[in-house]
């Protein structure tokens, strides 16, 4: 793991790959190995009590990464690499693309005399502006702005693990007076097992069908981006969408103190927290295909099972201060076609009051966030019936949370 991280850092920095030199010590019946890694001209020695050669190389790479991370931001090799290669701008662009937002917009202002200009740049992402340090060139000023934006966003990063899924990134985003919980996670547990079984089934036709479906999805996303959100302005569409969840998440509870810390506010423990059912509104994305009801039913059962297991691990106690209620995947696993009568019965989903569908997401129509906010008191099981469900949680105990 550490060797891979060190190698990735070398590739991003356009340096030569790390080289390892190992020595063997001790008697033949109990050998000990020690490794030395050379990275960008610097040598780092690992411990000498490793029992295998592989363990010694990983230990040396771990020592190198630890020493590089302890250096100051101005002299850190990692910071220099990220700054010089423009990785911060790439990270912001990838974040906006994965979240379904508009790409970051950079605004640069030139000041000072002509022979010694000074450039100051600001970047706008998801309705929030971040200003970077002044620089002598426009390119460097934009890098500074991207670095400031990424550092500010990383301060709200909360990493947690909830079986059967591993949450790669959990953000508390304050936007428009509301608090949105955004979860990016890698598929695991039941969802990952089903996907692995589909990959290893040996059915060539099924894999080809999956490729065609993926290509069609990319085409729909391009068409949707060209149309500017399907009939509304691009600015309004990006403001409504905030951040979009691509992968799978389970029902989980998040303390108000954690959300308040992410929002930059202190939490008053004396004030009672509102109930999760009264503070949650849903955005329902119905599918156009007739099989969506059957698929979503399977996803609902899997999510409910994961939620019960998570509640059992917490001793049956539910924290209603801030509740991120069941974010579903873009497309649930495929199942056989059910009879039309069963499909019609499963497609009877209560619609949020005043829920228009002004624009479409990739292949799916999406209700607006404002209309879904009117559906107070609805259970998540009533909203999760078909397609994609994104649930917004408003934390009333945090008065006017400031953007992060």
Curated annotation (Swiss-Prot):
Basic residues bias located where?
302-316
> One GO molecular function term?
double-stranded RNA binding
Which keywords does this Swiss-Prot/TrEMBL entry list?
Answer: Repeat, RNA-binding
List where Low complexity composition bias occurs. Answer: 263-280
* A Pfam short name: dsrm
Q: Does the keyword Kinase apply?
A: no
Ranges of residues in domain DRBM = 1-70, 87-155
Q: Which Gene3D superfamilies match?
A: 3.30.160.20
Q: Where is this region: Disordered?
A: 195-236, 263-320, 336-362
UniProt function note? Binds double-stranded RNA.
What name does this protein carry?
Double-stranded RNA-binding protein 5
Provide the species name: Oryza sativa subsp. japonica (Rice)
User: What gene does the UniProt entry assign to this protein?
Assistant: DRB5
